[in-house]
Design a protein with these regions (language model features):
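Positively charged n-region of N-terminal signal peptides that target proteins for export
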Residues: 1-4
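Bacterial N-terminal signal peptides
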Residues: 7-15
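Acidic, polar ligand-binding/catalytic clefts
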Residues: 73-99
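Short, conserved active-site loops that position catalytic residues or coordinate cofactors/metal ions
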Residues: 69, 100-101
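Serine endopeptidase catalytic core focused on the charge-relay Asp
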Residues: 104
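Sec/Tat signal peptide C-region and signal peptidase I cleavage site
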Residues: 16-20
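Exported/periplasmic ABC-transporter solute-binding proteins
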Residues: 21-51, 55, 60, 64-70, ...
Length: 267
């Protein structure tokens, strides 16, 4: 009888340990490719007993998942799209978490000469003038939206470009692989580039223009629109993401001695 009681108690302990809370978070491919999730998720599990299931997609698709109530929160990087999401009543509030920047990558020989450009608009104009191979995400991601806005700011229409401009409809890692294989120019977030293992003959050629600022924000899905979402868990995760511990982990995350993100949440 004693063995049965002990066995039942052990089963209850095991069952309790197995029943950690779960929530679904849509994140961008650029965030996932950075490797930061592998640092944050185990600490979230340890501190909150919360399993965060990531759906890795572009910002546009992440927002559509939020609008459909298929996730509990989103972590994305396209402010205009985020504000439209909130205006439509799909999210409760937008909380800025961290930032990095976009950079222009290209062949080490830099036939278009963008390394000497004064700003991002000039760099893009030089690529277009040279007809140099350029790979675009082409996937409605935050990175793709930003790239298109930069072409437009330079007075250029990406839809009118010739065969030198290749939209691949893929995530950041796959797009970087394509650029590496083609020896082409590409715009990437800095974190994905630093964590990319197949650089080949590519190099970081241009960065530093303030227009290349890249802010990441967290938005819980509105439970009044989607009653089934786990809003309480989404809010717990938000509070963790703006904590001192999260700040230390985000600011301390480096590759080859270079920081990938800067924490800037207001608390």
């Amino acid at each position: 009888m004693k063995r049965l009681v002990l066995g039942a108690a052990a089963s209850l302990v095991l069952a309790s340990a197995a029943l950690a809370e779960e929530m679904r978070l849509a994140v961008t491919t650029s965030f996932h490719n950075s490797g930061l999730a592998e640092v944050l998720l185990p600490e979230i599990k340890k501190d909150l007993d919360l399993d965060v299931q990531l759906l890795v997609v572009g910002t546009g698709q992440a927002i559509r998942l939020g609008e459909a109530g298929d996730v509990d929160a989103i972590l994305v990087h396209s402010k205009k799209a985020e504000e439209a999401f909130l205006a439509g009543g799909h999210g409760t509030r937008r909380r800025e978490i961290m930032y990095n920047d976009f950079v222009f990558i290209g062949p080490e020989g830099d036939a278009a000469g963008i390394a000497g450009a004064e700003d991002a608009a000039e760099a893009l104009q030089q690529i277009a003038d040279a007809g140099a191979a350029f790979v675009s995400r082409g996937d409605d991601s935050g990175t793709h939206k930003k790239e298109l806005s930069l072409w437009a700011s330079a007075g250029l229409d990406a839809e009118a470009f010739g065969p030198w401009y290749r939209a691949v409809g893929a995530g950041m890692g796959a797009a970087l692989n394509t650029a590496s294989g083609m020896d082409a120019y590409i715009m990437s977030d800095r974190a994905s580039w630093l964590n990319f293992g197949n650089k080949g003959g590519l190099a970081l050629l241009f960065a530093g223009d303030p227009v290349l600022f890249n802010q990441y924000a967290y938005i819980p899905v509105n439970p009044e629109m989607h009653g089934h979402v786990k809003h309480g868990l989404a809010m717990q995760l938000e509070e963790w993401l703006v904590s001192d511990k999260a700040a230390a982990l985000i600011n301390g995350y480096q590759i080859n001695g270079e920081a990938l993100f800067v924490f800037n949440a207001k608390r």
